[in-house]
């Protein structure tokens, strides 16, 4: 089968022919239909996330089951499925026992120590798969397994109250979904975007207002929750000034630079800084349900699998608007 392979740290993606895998215990073989390229793929390619090379990345994989292991009874051939970052865990550590599998130190993760979705076929652990609603196209479903899951988890983890105001910082691959989720959930939603050329589109996504920075957000009345999808620690720091008392900054973007925050600001306004990822399988179900009901739509660029290196470079250069999807 054809696959996009990262042969070594910081190397270019290469299309290679590799053996098609066969399902082992508790696994299903999935004929891939779409696989999203996330900016985390860049971090993995550069070796920022530990793991062995060569690698086949892709942690937004969706497709159709074409074979199952004999012990699998919950899934069948023909099912439309996807899987998220964490597929399997040890089941014995403290975090597994507490139901927080995403913290298991022995987890098996899609595209990290398990083959990812940037290939014609992929193995998935059956009990880690989610059924995709029949009315959701594969290209729309794929980004929800990371981008959508992540931003909806962040909003849920912040536990907004009905009267609270939500700001989304950074309108890109995650941010354009965060605006839609916040609005679909019924919250007054403000977007923080440095790009005036995006303003019309951002309002069409559901934003009630668009501001340029933290100062602009403060002038507009501030926010109770900021969903920060930017990759700039400096911008995150700037936005904190606009949080209202008891405000929450939810960080979903990554930057190697430290976050410079005044403890006095946190103390006086009782501000919380929350790191958030894919927090609960229930949130993935909810994130997909919004898409199935037509309340959230991903803006995607699609590329055939053979053009994976080109699509990856679009993501590296920040030119993809807003999610790059490989189709098979």
Language-model-detected regions and their locations in the chain:
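C-terminal hydrophobic helical "lid"/dimerization subdomain
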Residues: 1, 237, 281-328
